[in-house]
């Protein structure tokens, strides 16, 4: 009942999407998912996740959500998977304690097949800056699955770049060895974000042998693409990139 209800909601949302076919084609190029894409934009998906969570019609519990994800069929669309992930952290789920949210996130990461399904569920939130989420993020870094590693890296970037843990983040980033493109791009993104508030520390790390040539180049590139650096720092980054 819940599955068919959610699919019905997704179909309705897809029909209301303007320029749907163009959006589907665009999404197909960048999402790199094997699943069908309905063509629903993120704001609408987030809105739908909240509506389903609040709906008396669905009354989705943690057990229901766990079952939905564990029984994820190959014919479920991309947006269906992402919707499950978004519902994990809906504010209306006040009965979901920290351990439950982490457990559900672990299950969700078993069914994702796109970087966007990972990045879209990670938010900067003090509820996710606890020791339990820190430990979970570190656990993800050593996983064999590319998207799980990406989740760990992006989680550290979103919630743990502070004075207390910055050196620990750098130390842990050195241990990431996954060769997948999206795992390595997450590392480059991490360093570029880190450089905003910890510029000298990050530049020193990027210049060291602790960072691969590929990640280093991409990190410099992402820094130069950002508008968060002063002209002086951009010049310094460009100089490091050329050396």
Where are these regions (language model features)?
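Alpha-helical scaffold domains
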Residues: 1-243
